Regions:
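Active-site-proximal helix/loop segments of hydrolytic enzymes
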Residues: 1-210
Length: 210
């Protein structure tokens, strides 16, 4: 089940975006955008995950905030509070959580990027790393997807096409499904169904949208 962070064009503060995902107990957070560049020939999709620098700075902020410390940190349905822990233990627990989330984010982003490559050109051939605020959740795998360049006339036309947007959505969903099939998290559909993969459909064909 998908939960929208926003359903209209209202602005939502960057940190509140991933915090809403945490409150919804999301298994994954995906931020979807259209890219822009001064070079109007730039084209293709990109997928980003949080850089090591971003993870380190976020960990420091998280531990310094008493409200955050009382929150629950965990991966795959196992959560603990940092509020009653020795400071050194808190650092270790948060580090373990972040490392696990980083690996999961990278794996999921790699699957999504491959699925987008099947649909069309990729601007970057590999998953990129950046210190984007929306990617800083300490315990939810997160990625940011640039679906194409709105400054490129051809891609702007495609992005304005409902059919192309359906294909993009389907390609992204197939990449996410592939990740959960490979690494089913406790409590998810794929864990309950015994890791059974759905029949594959070529993203470029449009397919039948679930």
């Amino acid at each position: 089940r998908a939960v929208l962070i926003r359903s209209d064009d209202q602005f939502v503060a960057l940190q509140d975006r991933y915090m809403r995902a945490r409150r919804a107990k999301a298994d994954m957070f995906i931020s979807i955008h259209a890219d822009a560049a001064e070079n109007h020939a730039a084209s293709g999709s990109s997928v980003y995950v949080l850089s090591d620098k971003g993870a380190s700075s976020q960990a420091a902020r998280w531990l310094a905030d008493k409200e955050n410390a009382a929150d629950l940190i965990g991966v795959g349905g196992t959560s603990v509070s940092l509020d009653d822990k020795d400071p050194n233990l808190s650092v270790t627990l948060l580090d373990l959580s972040q490392n696990a989330i980083k690996r999961m984010s990278e794996d999921a982003a790699g699957n999504v990027l491959q699925s987008l490559k099947d649909l069309g050109k990729a601007h970057k051939k590999q998953v990129e790393y950046a210190n984007f605020v929306v990617l800083r959740s300490p315990d939810v795998p997160s990625m940011l997807i640039e679906t194409g360049f709105i400054t490129n006339a051809d891609e702007e036309r495609k992005l304005n096409s409902p059919e192309h947007r359906k294909r993009l959505a389907y390609a992204i969903s197939q990449g996410v499904r592939a990740f959960f099939i490979e690494q089913p998290l406790p409590g998810t559909y794929y864990a309950r169904s015994g890791n059974i993969a759905p029949a594959g459909v070529n993203a470029a064909s449009g397919g039948v949208f679930p």
